[in-house]
């Protein structure tokens, strides 16, 4: 049963009306889609003594236990565990539903059979990147692909992209959400869009040629890869005139990288570009976007789509929902998905200021927004630089600090063990490609002062590279995602670490 949606009024409803409609949609979704056809949640609800009748409001979600990524991973006892989260409809049960019988009478059995196939049969898949665990596949039906286009098209709408404008999608071609989301964004809003497949498909030079030939107004990419594309084009003294909006995703987008990208665009002949950061994750089959803002302006937060799902913010320690405007962990529940479905999914991502329902200061839309920085819990690591104690390093903030420092074009953090001994102390090497006219000695001093003052880190080595060598180190155009943080520490059971890049000798500075 398809849940009624509000594609035209989705951004004009007040908080009370939106929450009431979400509560009704949640009840119907559980009753008609999830509990009849999800092996995992049918068993979970039975075990907890719950039914769809226990859920009539967003607040009722507290009755439902969280789903975590670990719940989706295969086990020796259940190697196909992920499929327990995929909706597997019973054809006989569907055929007996009064709504289906009525549709068959009005439209004919063959047409309704085709409609049910399109709604329920998986035909597409994306997967998690496998950064922290093995990749987890998420199945889509044609119904889900329609929702994918609906959500992606809202990025085009919020960005104010006109039908006569052109987009170039530089996201890497892979079964990952970012590439396909922006692929369907152009289709949904009938906007011309070229998907290059990123650096691994066409190479950095190939992407530059595509931009030169198409002369787009909108570029869509990961920030690090886009920086390298623009920086190389600037080295070659090319012109990318007419760029208006940069849509960024897949990585953090701190103020420093916004400013560097805008400065490169101006150098290439496109002053005044505005930037839209997006936030999404595979498990949501969805991504949200900011309004376009100029570098230096405070981003207004990510516009959520309340007709497609519920975003809760919880205290990560207690699991309790927090008030609006308070930070916490992001939890996701869909309202209209088929294929793979997860309820109350704990993302491990923390929103600095949680959800606000105040009208957006940029566009005036009244739907909820995620406000402030978003950080991944898994990016907080314990490192042992001394014999006596460890140091907790928040790599979320460390990456932002490096991106925000003037004089740095690109960088890579390399984690190693002293003497390649897995039982020895941790070491940090910082690889840097300078930008601008900051003297190397001054840049080194600034880096050491900043890292020690803010993070209690003293890099073992700071190594300076040319932009081309740093591109090779980050595997630009080789890896699906540029490598900004590389952990080469050997496991205690393994031999010495390897895998370093063969580069021209860098200009090295030691503490």
Predicted regions span which residues?
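Conserved beta-strand termini and adjacent loop/short-helix elements that scaffold enzyme active sites
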Residues: 196, 278, 314, 416, ...
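Nucleotide 5′-phosphate-binding alpha/beta core
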Residues: 1-127, 133-150, 158, 426-431, ...
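AMP-binding/adenylate-forming catalytic core of the ANL superfamily
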Residues: 219, 331-455, 460, 480
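Detector for glycine-centered tight turns/loop "hinges" at secondary-structure junctions
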Residues: 133, 237, 318-319, 480
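Short hydrophobic segments within beta-strands
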Residues: 170, 248-249, 431-433, 483
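Generic structural signal for residues in well-ordered beta-strands
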Residues: 193, 275, 311, 411-413, ...
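Active-site phosphate/ATP/adenylate-binding loop shared across adenylate-forming ligases
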Residues: 3-11, 68-276, 284, 288-294, ...
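Conserved AMP-binding/adenylate-forming
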Residues: 253-359
């Amino acid at each position: 049963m398809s849940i009624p949606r509000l594609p035209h009024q989705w951004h004009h409803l007040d908080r009370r009306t939106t929450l009431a409609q979400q509560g009704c949609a949640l009840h119907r979704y559980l009753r008609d889609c999830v509990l009849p056809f999800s092996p995992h949640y049918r068993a979970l609800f039975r075990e907890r003594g719950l039914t769809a009748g226990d859920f009539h409001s967003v607040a009722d979600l507290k009755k439902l236990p969280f789903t975590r990524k670990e719940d989706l991973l295969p086990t020796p006892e259940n190697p196909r565990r992920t499929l327990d989260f995929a909706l597997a409809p019973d054809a006989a049960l569907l055929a007996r539903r009064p709504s289906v019988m009525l549709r068959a009478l009005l439209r004919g059995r063959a047409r309704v059979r085709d409609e049910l196939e399109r709604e329920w049969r998986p035909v597409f898949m994306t997967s998690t990147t496998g950064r922290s665990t093995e990749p987890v596949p998420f199945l889509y039906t044609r119904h889900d692909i329609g929702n994918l286009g609906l959500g992606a098209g809202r990025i085009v709408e919020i960005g104010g992209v006109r039908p006569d404008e052109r987009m170039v999608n530089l996201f890497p071609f892979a079964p990952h959400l970012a590439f396909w989301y922006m692929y369907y964004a152009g289709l949904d809003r009938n906007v011309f869009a070229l998907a290059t497949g990123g650096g691994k498909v066409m190479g950095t030079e190939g992407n530059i040629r595509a931009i030169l030939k198409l002369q787009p107004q909108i570029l869509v990419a990961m920030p690090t890869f886009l920086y390298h594309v623009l920086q190389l084009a600037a080295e070659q003294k090319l012109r990318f005139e007419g760029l208006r909006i940069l849509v960024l995703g897949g990585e953090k987008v701190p103020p420093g990288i916004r400013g560097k990208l805008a400065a490169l665009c101006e150098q290439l002949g496109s002053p005044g570009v505005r930037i839209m950061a997006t936030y999404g994750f595979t498990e949501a089959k969805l991504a949200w976007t900011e309004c376009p803002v100029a570098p230096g302006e405070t981003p207004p937060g990510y516009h959520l789509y309340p007709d497609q799902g519920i975003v809760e913010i919880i205290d990560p320690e207690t699991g309790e929902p927090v008030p609006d405007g308070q930070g916490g962990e992001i939890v996701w529940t869909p309202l209209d998905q088929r294929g793979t479905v997860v309820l109350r999914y704990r993302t491990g991502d923390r929103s600095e200021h949680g959800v606000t329902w105040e009208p957006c200061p940029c566009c005036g839309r009244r739907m909820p927004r995620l406000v402030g920085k978003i950080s991944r819990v898994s990016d907080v690591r314990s490192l042992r630089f001394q014999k006596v104690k460890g140091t907790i390093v928040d790599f979320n903030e460390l990456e932002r600090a490096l991106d925000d420092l003037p004089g740095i074009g690109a960088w890579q953090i390399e984690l190693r063990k002293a003497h390649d001994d897995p039982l020895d102390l941790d070491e940090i090497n910082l690889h840097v490609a300078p930008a601008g006219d900051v003297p190397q000695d001054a840049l080194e001093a600034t880096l050491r002062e900043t890292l020690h003052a803010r993070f209690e880190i003293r890099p073992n080595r700071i190594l300076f590279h040319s932009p081309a060598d740093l591109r090779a180190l980050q595997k630009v155009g080789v890896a699906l995602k540029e490598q900004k943080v590389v952990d080469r520490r050997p496991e205690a059971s393994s031999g010495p670490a390897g895998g370093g890049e063969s580069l021209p000798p860098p200009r090295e500075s030691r503490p």
